[in-house]
C-alpha cells in the first residue's frame, strides 16, 4: 500500500471539490505534513497558488483575496502552531463575512498526546469562530470517494459567510510512490471529473426580504446610515437616498461619496441633533461604523422604526434598537424597495455639513499633517484603482475629515479592528483585482506586519504604501489614558524610520516634507509603476489633538 500516493489522491479530490464551489485562489505556507495538499494544489489547473513564509500573514493575504474577489479562498498550512497563526484572519472573516477555507494538515491520531513532534490537538482549536468545522479521517481507500466529495459539498453549502476549518490528518510517508496507484478509487466518481459542478448540489432557502409596509414608511421622515458595503452598493444607495429626500450619513467604508461630509464633526452640533431627532425611521445599511459621534447618535436615536440591512446574519447593532434585522445584500433590498421622489426634509444638515467641510479646509489649508493627509486623501487616489485603509487613528481621521469618491473601492479590516495583518490584507486585495492600489496605515501597524512587504513587492500594478509615522499608537491620545503612563504603556513609541525596511524588500522609498511633495511623489508612482513605501513623519499627538479641536470648533459654528 502506497500511503503517500493515496494521501495525494485524497487531497486532489478535496481541492477539486472546493474548486467546484468557486475557490480559485489558494494560499500556501511551507511545511512537510501539508505536502499532499500542496502538491495537489500545484497540480490543479483551476487554482492560482500564492505562497508566504508567515502563516499569520498568509491568513490575512487570503482574507484580502476573499474581500476583493468576493469568492471563497483556501489556505494550506502544516500542523502545530502554524495552524494557530490563522486565528486572527479567521476571526476577522467571521465578523466581516469573507469566506475562508482553512486546510490544516495534521498528524494522524496515534501521534497526538504522546510527545510526537509538531503534534497538537487541532480539531476544535478555533472554538466557535469557524462557521463550519470538519475533522476528516486519516485517508484510506476504505472510505468511498463520494463520501469525501459530498462531505466537502455539504460544508460549502453551509458556508454563507466566515470560515470553514477542515482538519486533514496525513500519515507518513508523504513523498514518492507510483502515481498510478489507486486510480480506480478516483474513477468511481465517473464523469464528474469532466464536469464543472459539485457532486452534491444543495439549494439555499431564499430569505423573505420584502417589507410589506415599505410604501407607508417611504413617505415618512427617514435617515439613512451607510456602513460597510461594496462600491456598487454604496453608489446605488447614495442615488436611492437622494431620490427619497432622506439625509445619508456615510461611513468611510460606505463608498457612497459621503454626501454629507465631515459627519463625525457636525453630528456634535446641537442644531444638527435637533433636526435628526425628527426622524421617524432610520435605515442602516451595513455595519462596522467608525465615527465616535455617529456611534453616539446611533445609540441615542429613538425613531419609531429602526431597520438594519446587511447580508451577514446576527444583531450587528450594539445599541439594541427595537426594529427589524433584515438579512439581505444591500443591492437586492434596494431593488425590491424603490424610492419615491420627495423633497428633502432635512436640508439644514447640508448647511452644517458644508460649514464643517469649509472650516476643516480653512484649518488645514497650510498644514502638512496627519489630519491634512486624511482630509486630502482623495487627491492621491489612482484612477481606476482602489484604497486600503488601516485601523486605529488614521481611519478615524479619514472618516471625520475626508470625502472619498462615490463608488470608489475601499477595503479595510473593521470587523475586529486589529492592526495585525493589514499589509498582508492589502496585498491580497491588490492580487485579487490587479488594480493600482493605495494603502495607508500607521507606523505600529506597519511594524506589526513588516514581513508582508515581501508580499507587496509582488504587486502586479502600481502600489503605494503610505506609512503615517506619528511614533506610536497615538489613538490613545484621544482616550483618557493616564498621562504619566500614556507613552510607555499605551502609545509605545518605537523611534523608527522605514527607509531601510523598504530597501531590504527592494521597494521604492520617499519621505516628502510638504503636501505638494507628497502629491507629486504619489503621482510619479502611478506613472512609474512598481511598489513604493512613502513615509510621512508627523508630530506624535498632533492628529489626535487636531481632531478634538475641530469637533469642538464645529459644534460651536
UniProtKB/Swiss-Prot annotation:
Catalytic activity: isochorismate + 2-oxoglutarate + H(+) = 5-enolpyruvoyl-6-hydroxy-2-succinyl-cyclohex-3-ene-1-carboxylate + CO2
Enzyme class: transferase
Cofactor note text: Binds 1 thiamine pyrophosphate per subunit.
Entry's Gene Ontology BP terms: menaquinone biosynthetic process
Cofactors, names only: Mg(2+); Mn(2+); thiamine diphosphate
Coiled coil stretches, renumbered: none
Highest taxon of source: Bacteria
Pathway entry: Quinol/quinone metabolism; 1,4-dihydroxy-2-naphthoate biosynthesis; 1,4-dihydroxy-2-naphthoate from chorismate: step 2/7; Quinol/quinone metabolism; menaquinone biosynthesis
Molecular function per GO: 2-succinyl-5-enolpyruvyl-6-hydroxy-3-cyclohexene-1-carboxylic-acid synthase activity; magnesium ion binding; manganese ion binding; thiamine pyrophosphate binding
Assigned keywords, A-Z: Magnesium, Manganese, Menaquinone biosynthesis, Metal-binding, Thiamine pyrophosphate, Transferase
EC number(s) on file: 2.2.1.9
Pfam families, per database record: TPP_enzyme_C (PF02775), TPP_enzyme_M_2 (PF16582), TPP_enzyme_N (PF02776)
CDD domains for the chain: TPP_PYR_MenD, TPP_SHCHC_synthase
Function according to Swiss-Prot or TrEMBL: Catalyzes the thiamine diphosphate-dependent decarboxylation of 2-oxoglutarate and the subsequent addition of the resulting succinic semialdehyde-thiamine pyrophosphate anion to isochorismate to yield 2-succinyl-5-enolpyruvyl-6-hydroxy-3-cyclohexene-1-carboxylate (SEPHCHC).
Subunit structure: Homodimer.
Annotated family: Belongs to the TPP enzyme family. MenD subfamily.
Protein name: 2-succinyl-5-enolpyruvyl-6-hydroxy-3-cyclohexene-1-carboxylate synthase
Organism: Yersinia enterocolitica serotype O:8 / biotype 1B (strain NCTC 13174 / 8081)
Gene name per UniProt: menD
Amino acid at each position: 500500500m502506497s500511503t503517500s500516493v493515496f494521501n495525494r489522491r485524497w487531497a486532489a479530490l478535496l481541492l477539486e471539490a472546493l474548486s467546484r464551489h468557486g475557490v480559485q485562489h489558494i494560499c500556501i505556507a511551507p511545511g512537510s505534513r501539508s505536502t499532499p495538499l500542496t502538491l495537489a494544489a500545484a497540480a490543479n489547473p483551476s487554482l492560482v497558488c500564492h505562497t508566504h513564509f508567515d502563516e499569520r500573514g498568509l491568513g490575512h493575504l487570503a482574507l484580502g483575496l476573499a474581500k476583493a474577489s468576493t469568492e471563497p479562498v483556501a489556505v494550506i498550512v502544516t500542523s502545530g502552531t502554524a495552524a494557530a497563526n490563522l486565528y486572527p484572519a479567521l476571526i476577522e472573516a467571521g465578523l466581516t463575512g469573507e469566506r475562508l477555507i482553512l486546510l490544516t494538515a495534521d498528524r494522524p491520531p496515534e501521534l497526538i498526546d504522546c510527545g510526537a513532534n509538531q503534534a497538537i490537538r487541532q480539531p476544535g482549536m478555533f472554538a466557535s469562530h469557524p462557521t463550519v468545522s470538519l475533522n476528516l479521517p486519516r485517508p484510506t481507500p476504505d472510505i468511498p470517494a463520494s463520501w469525501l466529495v459530498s462531505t466537502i459539498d455539504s460544508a460549502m453549502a453551509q458556508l454563507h459567510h466566515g470560515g470553514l476549518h477542515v482538519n486533514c490528518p496525513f500519515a507518513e510517508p508523504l513523498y514518492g510512490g507510483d502515481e498510478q496507484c489507486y486510480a480506480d478509487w478516483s474513477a468511481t466518481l465517473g464523469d464528474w471529473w469532466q464536469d464543472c459542478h459539485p457532486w452534491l448540489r444543495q439549494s439555499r432557502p431564499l430569505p423573505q426580504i420584502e417589507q410589506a409596509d415599505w410604501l407607508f414608511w417611504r413617505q415618512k421622515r427617514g435617515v439613512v446610515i451607510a456602513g460597510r458595503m461594496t462600491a456598487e452598493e454604496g453608489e446605488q444607495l447614495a442615488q436611492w437616498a437622494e431620490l427619497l429626500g432622506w439625509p445619508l450619513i456615510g461611513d468611510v467604508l460606505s463608498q457612497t461619496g459621503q454626501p454629507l461630509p465631515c459627519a463625525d464633526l457636525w453630528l456634535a452640533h446641537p442644531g444638527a441633533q435637533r433636526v435628526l431627532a425628527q426622524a421617524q425611521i432610520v435605515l442602516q445599511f451595513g455595519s462596522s461604523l467608525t465615527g465616535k459621534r455617529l456611534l453616539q447618535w446611533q445609540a441615542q436615536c429613538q425613531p419609531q422604526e429602526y431597520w438594519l440591512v446587511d447580508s451577514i446574519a446576527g444583531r450587528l447593532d450594539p445599541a439594541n434598537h427595537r426594529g427589524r434585522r433584515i438579512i439581505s445584500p444591500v443591492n437586492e433590498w434596494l431593488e425590491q424597495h424603490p424610492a419615491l421622489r420627495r423633497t428633502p426634509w432635512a436640508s439644514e444638515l447640508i448647511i452644517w455639513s458644508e460649514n464643517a467641510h469649509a472650516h476643516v479646509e480653512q484649518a488645514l489649508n497650510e498644514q502638512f499633517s496627519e489630519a491634512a493627509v486624511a482630509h486630502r486623501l482623495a487627491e492621491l487616489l489612482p484612477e481606476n484603482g482602489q484604497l486600503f485603509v488601516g485601523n486605529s487613528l488614521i481611519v478615524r481621521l479619514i472618516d471625520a475629515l475626508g470625502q472619498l469618491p462615490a463608488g470608489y473601492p475601499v477595503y479595510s479590516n473593521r470587523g475586529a479592528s486589529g492592526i495585525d495583518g493589514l499589509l498582508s490584507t492589502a496585498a491580497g486585495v491588490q492580487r485579487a483585482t490587479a488594480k493600482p492600489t493605495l494603502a495607508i496605515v500607521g507606523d505600529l501597524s506597519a511594524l506589526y506586519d513588516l514581513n508582508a512587504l515581501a508580499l507587496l513587492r509582488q504587486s502586479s500594478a502600481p502600489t503605494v504604501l503610505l506609512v503615517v509615522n506619528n511614533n506610536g499608537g497615538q489613538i490613545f491620545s484621544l482616550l483618557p489614558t493616564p498621562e504619566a503612563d500614556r507613552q510607555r504603556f499605551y502609545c509605545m513609541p518605537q523611534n523608527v524610520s522605514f527607509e531601510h525596511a523598504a530597501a531590504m524588500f527592494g521597494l521604492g522609498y520617499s519621505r516628502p516634507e510638504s503636501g505638494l511633495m507628497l502629491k507629486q511623489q504619489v503621482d510619479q508612482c502611478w506613472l512609474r509603476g512598481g511598489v513604493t513605501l512613502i513615509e510621512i513623519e508627523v508630530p506624535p499627538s498632533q492628529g489626535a489633538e487636531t481632531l478634538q479641536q475641530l469637533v469642538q470648533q464645529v459644534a460651536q459654528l
